[in-house]
Each structure stands twice: as C-alpha cells, then as structure tokens.
Amino acid sequence: DNVIDILANMGFFTQIERMADAGVLYQVISDFTADNADMNPEKISAIDMGNVFENLVQRFSESYDEEAGAHFTSRDIIYLMCDLLTMNADSYDEDTPAKTVYDMAMGTSQMLTCMEERIHALDKEAEIICYGQEINPFTFGIAKADMLIRGGDPENMQFGNTLNADKFKGYT
C-alpha cells in the first residue's frame, strides 16, 4: 500500500506512459535491470541509497529554477539548522527511550534525515522516531519513499496541509 501511495503521488504511472510514448521505456528498464545496476540492500547501504536519492532530488530541483526552494534545501543549510537545534547536548537525556522529530512542512524530508544523523552523533543508541507532513503530492511521495529506503515507518509521513488538516495534532 505504501509503495502504491508513493507511486500515485509522484505521477509514476503517467511517467511510464510518457516514456513509452517517447520510445525510451525499454532503455530505462534495461538500465535499471543491468548486472551493474544491482541495488540490493546487501550491496548498497540505506545511507548510500539515501545519498543517491538526495542527489537525484537535488538534480530534479535544479531543473526547476523558480521552484527549487520548494523541493530542495542545501544540506549545508539543513545541517546548520540541525546544529542550532542540538547545540545544548546536555538536554539529550540518554535514558529517554525515544526521541521524536517532527517537520510540519517536510518537503522531501531531508531535515528529518539530517536531524536523525545529528542526534545519533550525540547518542549512538538513541531511538529516533521521525514524523512529517507535506502538502505537495510529489515531494510527499519522495519523503515517503525516503522513509521506506531508510527503514523507517512510512506511516509517519502524512500527506496534507498542516495548517487546516494537521495529521499530528499535539506533536509540537
């Protein structure tokens, strides 16, 4: 169900039709099924897959100059924000069973990924539960796919307008 939700929100089926109409669908499928394109989790870690995914998101965003900010925020800026939020390392109680991170306008969810990384740098054993909501169906699909790739709970990624249909009331 999660994968179908992701594919539908990202317009995947429309893209398949476009590639077929353009005569490139066979080549794309051939490239992804080639011997050197083995993306088995035993060969590519979740972190590496996330980096590949982020690179694709960045390239996609750069192709839409006027809307790039709606899809992609530089990792440097995200890390700066995460560092500001985690400046007081003493506030991270190692006895707390789980830490939650919530992004009300998550875009592609890269802020959640970076925050998770920064918290793990402070406490390697921390259980981190990420939540997010996004109004744009395409970037929501990317965020939910990223959560699946990283092994998180995709149900914690919700589609909708946080201002008038908050799916995580009480999380802030």
Identify the residue ranges that each predicted region occupies:
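Conserved S-adenosyl-L-methionine
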Residues: A68-Y171
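Non-catalytic, mostly N-terminal accessory regions of nucleic-acid modification and defense proteins
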Residues: D1-A89, N156-A165
